């Protein structure tokens, strides 16, 4: 009886001891941008006891590992992506493998973890038999990515090596179930422990591509562990009773990112949070959340803006969410001109502009912003102050800020526009008491003066903690984290300093958004009334007119100046009749001119300055926009004296002037022999050469000179020679003769003519090729193109008759034209001049004409006489 009573008393004592144990809770740990979520019903007792004493009925242990990192899972293993190296650096799962192995036992230290596995092996060795084995099931659920194989291999081989002896003794049923893809399965079959593979205790679940699994399969890592945890958190399963009655232990380990943690908190939102998650984990989550918010706040307020796209876009995205990842970068060839940078001055601290209307409207709509500035407003305020080293446009540090020009020096040499800017700044300061923007600036300035010391301390501490260097503005920040190296590489191209150029980005809430409706006003009076609201220069880059909701209309009416000085000044013509989707305006929207308000300036100075402003603001097209490939001497050889274009133009001019005379022989001859008209005698400078008292203003008029000399040609019938006096042909056409009679004619004209008319006869060969010769002559030329010697057919009388009939009014002098100036040109000329004789009796003695082989003188080396001719490769001049 005493023994029975003693055993009952011992059992009651053990129940009270183990009843003081804590209930199962979820623990969360963060490491390397990843989170380790652990749930286990292995309860830790207040009084230390062995695993066999705590769980006398234990027969099964389930270890469930879920790897859910969507950033990695959605990339295929076979895909080569430029961000994979960055992902591998950020999500280094192999750094968590020791923590994952320790989480299987739900222990806090490595010593407790080793003690747990030793006690479990002792429990299996003492209780299990080949007939009654202990079950150890390990499930690894993931997307099967290659980025997980090293960690999975480490965990599986560690468990196998620990329980290999018990498995050989047939006291343990060891089973692994691993989700793999075809690529990761190939890797495991190659690099996993050969002994483990030969035992065939691993059940490979080939899920294929993870993207296909998302579409087709209902079993995903997130859904699986969500369901498991939900079952553990239900009320019926939460009261597991005494530990001595437990036969199965579950250990759920989840590796995920911040998205998975948010999903867990959403899952626990319907339950008392403190009863399901450990107090240490709640504290750790709060610290992590505060650190993230602090980093975001520091990025918005303390981090200086750099002259690169990523820094400015990050700042804009925090203010205006509609312009994310949209960077507009505009560079102009005329960016260095004074007219483009006259209305903006750059200091060492910031780029300052004149106050605009948008800030006034913003302040008027948000009155609470002036009374109690919010955190975002304070962050924006820190960017707008000069000490922030911002390279973006600032609009709130205008009226009360000191002069940005040190020692009276300006970045631009245009002192006129600088005086105008000073005048505008003085007028804005004079109207400070009547404008709302002054109140806003006063508040900001007071806050700035009070908090400047504190902000400098915060900036110093922030720089000391994170390694930022605010003095080096162009160098960029160097992070100590591995995952930011690729970000720096992406921004290297945009990190170059551009001292001369300016970069305009997508407009944010700080930029001035002007509208063409500000210009379209009913009259001068209304514009004068609204001058306080619309006065001030700005520069905006927008795609649409915010007021009209359509592309900007750049057609503005010319405002009439009320004073005499404005009326006497040149009219300003800046209107254009086209619409554009990019609107850049730099000028006053009101009709009044701030320069005219200065009474101490003379009208001449005002006119001079207004003309300078009109010239600067007038739209112009730069010649630099024309690519150099469109300016080529080969494509535009019209500057050459003997080019084909100039020759054809001269011939067309002559043909148009004497078209009627070419069709009537009698009128043509009468005109050529007629005296010089009286008005021509008075106007022509050629007739006044002997008069020393006359003023020869038009002595070099080539048009009059050419026509005077043309009318003084009594012997050479130019039109019957060059333009074919055969009336059967079209008189308006350039009906040039074939080469042989033309060469003879022109050679004779050059030798015997005493005047300067031979220059008009110096025609190129391509002008002769483009002539309207007879069809038979064209056939003869085509047939003899490839031959070296082309004999004139003496038996064919028609060939000679046609040539002679067409040259009835030509002198019998011999003409010679050396187009190529070759060595054999003399012999060729002798044969030609001797064989061809022209007379009024149409009798001709012909000899074989030796035609030169077709050659192409590309660079004009053989053409010594034609020094002004255009050849391939450039002008010879």
UniProtKB/Swiss-Prot annotation:
The keyword Phosphoprotein applies. There is a cross-link at residues 668, 670 (Glycyl lysine isopeptide (Lys-Gly) (interchain with G-Cter in ubiquitin)). Residues 369-414, 446-521, 550-579, 773-815 are annotated as: Disordered. Keywords: Coiled coil, Cytoplasm, Isopeptide bond, Phosphoprotein, Protein transport, Transport, Ubl conjugation. Residues 510-521, 551-579 have a biased composition (Polar residues). One of its GO terms (cellular component) is cytoplasm. Residues 470-501 have a biased composition (Acidic residues). The keyword Ubl conjugation applies. Residues 447-462 have a biased composition (Basic and acidic residues). It is found in: Cytoplasm. GO terms for biological process: protein transport. Residues 389-402, 805-815 have a biased composition (Low complexity). Residues 412-441 form a coiled coil. It comes from the Eukaryota. The modification Phosphoserine is found at residues 309-311, 332, 334, 692, 694, 706, 841. Interacts with ENV10/SND2. Functions in the SND pathway, a SRP (signal recognition particle) and GET (guided entry of tail-anchored proteins) independent pathway for targeting a broad range of substrate proteins to the endoplasmic reticulum. SND functions in parallel to GET in targeting proteins with downstream hydrophobic motifs. Present with 195 molecules/cell in log phase SD medium. This is SRP-independent targeting protein 1. The gene is SND1.
């Amino acid at each position: 009886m005493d023994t029975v009573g003693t055993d009952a008393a011992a059992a009651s004592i053990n129940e009270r001891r183990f009843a003081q144990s804590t209930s199962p809770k979820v623990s969360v740990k963060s490491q390397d941008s990843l989170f380790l979520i652990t749930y286990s019903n292995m309860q830790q007792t207040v009084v230390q006891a062995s695993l066999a004493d705590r769980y006398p009925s234990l027969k099964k242990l389930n270890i469930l590992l879920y790897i859910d990192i969507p950033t990695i899972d959605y990339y295929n293993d076979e895909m080569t992506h430029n961000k994979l190296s960055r992902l591998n650096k950020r999500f280094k799962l192999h750094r968590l493998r020791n923590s994952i192995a320790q989480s299987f036992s739900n222990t806090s230290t490595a010593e407790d973890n080793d003690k747990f596995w030793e006690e479990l092996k002792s429990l299996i060795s003492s209780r299990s038999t080949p007939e009654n084995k202990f079950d150890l099931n390990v499930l690894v659920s993931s997307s099967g990515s290659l980025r997980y194989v090293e960690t999975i291999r480490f965990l599986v081989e560690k468990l196998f090596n620990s329980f290999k002896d018990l498995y050989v003794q047939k006291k343990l049923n060891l089973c692994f179930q691993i989700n793999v893809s075809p690529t990761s399965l190939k890797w495991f079959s190659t690099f996993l422990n050969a002994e483990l593979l030969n035992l065939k205790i691993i059940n490979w679940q080939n899920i294929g591509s993870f993207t296909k699994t998302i579409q087709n399969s209902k079993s995903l890592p997130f859904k699986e562990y969500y369901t498991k945890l939900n079952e553990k958190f239900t009320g019926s399963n939460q009261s597991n009773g005494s530990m001595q009655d437990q036969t199965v232990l579950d250990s759920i380990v989840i590796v995920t990112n911040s998205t998975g943690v948010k999903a867990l908190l959403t899952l626990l939102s319907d339950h008392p949070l403190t009863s399901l998650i450990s107090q240490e984990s709640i504290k750790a989550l709060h610290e992590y959340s505060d650190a993230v918010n602090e980093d975001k706040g520091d990025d918005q307020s303390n981090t200086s803006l750099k002259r690169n796209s990523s820094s400015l876009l990050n700042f804009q995205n925090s203010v205006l969410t509609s312009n994310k990842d949209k960077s507009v970068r505009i560079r102009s060839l005329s960016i260095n001109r004074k007219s483009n940078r006259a209305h903006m001055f750059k200091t060492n601290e910031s780029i300052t502009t004149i106050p605009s209307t948008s800030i006034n409207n913003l302040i008027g709509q948000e009155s609470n912003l002036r009374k109690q500035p919010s955190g975002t407003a304070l962050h924006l305020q820190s960017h707008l102050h000069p000490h922030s080293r911002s390279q973006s446009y600032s609009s709130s540090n205008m009226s009360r800020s000191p002069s940005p020009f040190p020692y009276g020096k300006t970045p631009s040499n245009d002192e006129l526009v600088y005086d105008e800017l000073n005048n505008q700044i003085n007028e804005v300061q004079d109207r400070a008491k009547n404008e709302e923007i002054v109140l806003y600036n006063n508040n900001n300035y007071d806050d700035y003066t009070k908090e400047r010391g504190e902000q400098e301390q915060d900036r110093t501490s922030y720089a000391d903690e994170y390694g930022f260097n605010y003095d080096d503005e162009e160098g960029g920040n160097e992070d100590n984290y591995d995952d930011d190296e690729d970000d720096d590489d992406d921004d290297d191209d945009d990190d170059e300093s551009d001292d001369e150029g300016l970069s305009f980005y997508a407009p944010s809430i700080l930029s001035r958004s002007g509208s063409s409706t500000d210009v379209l006003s009913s009259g001068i009076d209304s514009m004068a009334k609204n001058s306080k609201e619309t006065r001030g220069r700005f520069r905006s880059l927008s795609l649409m007119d915010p007021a009209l909701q359509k592309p900007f209309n750049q057609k503005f009416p010319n405002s009439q100046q009320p004073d005499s000085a404005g009326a006497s000044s040149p009219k300003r013509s800046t209107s254009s009749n086209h619409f554009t989707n990019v609107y850049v305006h730099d000028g006053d929207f009101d009709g009044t001119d701030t320069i005219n308000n200065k009474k101490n300036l003379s009208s001449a100075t005002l006119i001079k300055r207004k003309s300078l402003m009109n010239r600067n603001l007038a739209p112009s097209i730069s010649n630099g926009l024309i690519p150099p490939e469109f300016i080529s001497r080969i494509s535009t050889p019209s500057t050459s004296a003997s080019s084909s274009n100039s020759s054809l133009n001269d011939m067309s001019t002559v043909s148009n002037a004497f078209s009627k005379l070419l069709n009537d022989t009698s009128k043509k001859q009468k005109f050529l022999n007629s005296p010089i008209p009286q008005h021509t005698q008075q106007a022509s400078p050629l007739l006044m050469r002997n008069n020393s008292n006359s003023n020869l203003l038009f002595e070099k008029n080539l048009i009059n000179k050419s026509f005077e000399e043309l009318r003084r040609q009594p012997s050479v019938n130019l039109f019957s020679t060059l333009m074919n006096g055969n009336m059967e042909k079209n008189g308006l056409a350039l009906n040039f003769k074939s080469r042989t009679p033309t060469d003879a004619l022109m050679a004779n004209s050059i030798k015997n003519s005493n005047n300067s008319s031979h220059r008009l006869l110096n025609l190129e060969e391509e002008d002769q090729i483009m002539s309207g010769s007879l069809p038979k002559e064209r056939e003869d030329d085509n047939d003899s193109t490839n031959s070296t010697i082309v004999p004139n057919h003496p038996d064919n009388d028609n060939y000679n008759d046609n040539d002679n009939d067409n040259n009835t009014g030509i002198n019998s002098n011999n003409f010679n034209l050396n187009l190529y100036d070759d060595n054999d040109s003399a012999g060729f000329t002798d044969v030609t001049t001797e064989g061809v004789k022209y007379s009024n009796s149409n009798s001709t003695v012909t000899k074989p004409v030796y035609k030169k082989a077709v050659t192409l003188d590309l660079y004009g080396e053989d053409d010594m006489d034609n020094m002004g001719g255009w050849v391939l490769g450039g002008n010879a001049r």
